């Protein structure tokens, strides 16, 4: 986490963090994110990172716990996260997203949203209810998932890609963008779990060539943009 502990002014945090290849982060505990980057901080991570992974192919952490509200990759305010190719990121608890652009508007930089760039061949998964693999909730934010990604959700109300409208004391959240690279796949298994969902004003969700979307649960649409 890029802000000092107990410092409520984290939207002003700044600096650059550089991490090489083969990073491994494992967290267990409610509201315990793998990465939580704030303010104007830039985080650069190399290839083949592993964050919040599944152990031995089973849907549990090493101690058997799940963690609610614990995201794998999270950027707040106008922070930037860049991760190289081969990322594996998984979450197990409820309301726990794999890639999350969050925290709406900054009072110091209200037009600057958070940015997340994920390299080729990412494997993103969530197991809990209300847990999306890619979640956009940042004013003017942007998420780019490069080609060949695999995105899988198992829980109910868990979308592959979501752009949600939001409001806060700092103002409304709008105009977020998500780009999904060519040859990527999106699969959802739970009820009410859409492949791609958008209700954010001004949001732009772009799917490149040969993106495949599969949904299995009841009331789970491939693409849904509801009327507000």
Task: Spell out what each predicted region is.
Residues 1-193, 197-220, 224-228:
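Surface-exposed loop/turn motifs in large extracellular/passenger domains
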């Amino acid at each position: 986490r890029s802000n000092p502990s107990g410092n409520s002014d984290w939207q002003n945090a700044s600096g650059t963090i550089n991490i090489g290849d083969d990073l491994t982060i494992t967290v267990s505990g409610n509201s315990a994110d793998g990465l939580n980057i704030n303010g104007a901080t830039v985080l650069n991570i190399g290839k083949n990172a592993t964050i919040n992974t599944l152990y031995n192919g089973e849907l549990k952490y090493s101690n058997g716990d799940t963690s609610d509200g614990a995201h794998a990759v999270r950027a707040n305010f106008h922070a930037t996260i860049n991760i190289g190719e081969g990322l594996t990121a998984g979450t197990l608890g409820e309301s726990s997203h794999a890639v999350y652009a969050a925290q709406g508007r900054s009072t110091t930089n209200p037009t600057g949203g958070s940015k997340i760039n994920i390299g080729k061949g990412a494997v993103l998964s969530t197991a809990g209810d209300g847990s999306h693999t890619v979640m956009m909730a940042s004013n003017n934010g942007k998420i780019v998932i490069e080609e060949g990604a695999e995105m899988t959700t198992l829980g109910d109300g868990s979308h592959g890609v979501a752009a949600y409208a939001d409001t806060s004391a700092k103002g409304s959240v709008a105009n977020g963008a998500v780009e999904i690279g060519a040859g990527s796949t999106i699969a959802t298994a739970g009820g009410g779990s859409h492949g791609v969902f958008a209700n954010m004003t001004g949001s732009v969700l772009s799917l490149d060539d040969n993106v495949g979307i599969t949904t299995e649960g009841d009331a789970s649409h491939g693409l849904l943009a509801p009327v507000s």
